[in-house]
């Protein structure tokens, strides 16, 4: 329900702010499950992903790395939002390999807010969905 979603978003925002001292400025719905009511209620830009590494499923650093590298090798990574989950240790291992590899191969890593400005030429808008 929308009430449950609002409670979950509020609790998450509070936890993030308590942990790092800054409130979230963007919102990624769990599992990508959202609708217009939730998007409006979140009062943040809604960020979806364009590359799913399936890291949550494989829990394998090399497979996660290979997934992103394959997209890059196919020329399908520029300007994309890569979904990875920080709760899995192998994802951290993949990230340690990916960041240097991406930089060595000419990629610039930016926040999703910066990406929206580059791709859309606008500041991220609350309630608007971005891929």
Feature map (PLM): residue ranges:
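Alpha-helical scaffold elements lining the catalytic groove of polysaccharide deacetylases
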Residues: 1-22, 33-78, 91-97
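Conserved, mostly hydrophobic/aromatic
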Residues: 12, 27, 46, 82, ...
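Surface-exposed helix-capping loop/turn segments at secondary-structure junctions
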Residues: 18-24, 105-109
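Low-complexity, flexible helical/coil segments
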Residues: 26, 61-64, 81-89, 116-124
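A generic alpha-helix propensity feature with a strong bias for hydrophobic helices
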Residues: 27, 32-33, 103, 127
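Active-site-proximal beta-strand/loop segments in catalytic clefts of secreted hydrolases
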Residues: 28-32, 49-52, 84-88, 112-115
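C-terminal domain-boundary segment and adjacent tail
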Residues: 90-131
């Amino acid at each position: 329900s929308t009430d449950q979603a609002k409670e979950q978003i509020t609790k998450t925002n509070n936890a993030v702010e308590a942990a790092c001292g800054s409130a979230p400025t963007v919102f990624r719905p769990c599992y990508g499950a959202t609708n217009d009511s939730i998007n409006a209620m979140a009062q943040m830009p809604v960020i979806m992903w364009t590359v799913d590494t399936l890291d949550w499923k494989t829990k394998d650093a090399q497979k996660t790395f290979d997934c992103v590298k394959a997209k890059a090798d196919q020329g399908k990574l520029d300007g994309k939002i890569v979904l990875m989950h920080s709760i899995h240790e192998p994802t951290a291992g993949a990230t340690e390999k990916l960041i240097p590899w991406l930089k060595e191969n000419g990629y610039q890593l930016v926040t999703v807010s910066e990406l929206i400005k580059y791709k859309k030429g606008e500041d991220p808008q609350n309630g608007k969905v971005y891929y």
